[in-house]
């Protein structure tokens, strides 16, 4: 009989159910759960406007990737109004620090902005693409490359990366085939594990 394991993260509206008895949850926070943390979050949410809550769900693209005239994307006004939850594909420790300082100085709610980037095959040190790495079957080298990318990107102020891409490529016309490990499910799962461990 299939076992049902329930992991309650003590958030009223989120429940995660894992049906596979062999599934292990890794990367759990070692921080203790405290009533003070619950009170802090509930108090913060009660003071936020609907607009600010929606803003925390908004992800903007960094200015460096835009062409043409300045738009509403990632404007100082959005930051000051607390409407930027995260920013994708913006780099450089100084740039990230400047944006975060502006956010903490001018926004009413003072929730730090999360910075993310597509770190698919390295950050400053560029490695072969994931599809090319998968051809090697060298899981130790793939794990080392992921670890180096994680160290470099976190040192630059990035909080999370949009990697690894673990989709199994079944159609060569798909534009993101090169970001994954190919069409083999066994190899793809082993490479995904190596990248996450890295």
Model-inferred region functions:
Residues 1-25:
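Ligand-recognition surfaces built from glycine- and aromatic
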Residues 26-198:
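N-terminal beta-rich core of secreted/periplasmic extracellular enzymes
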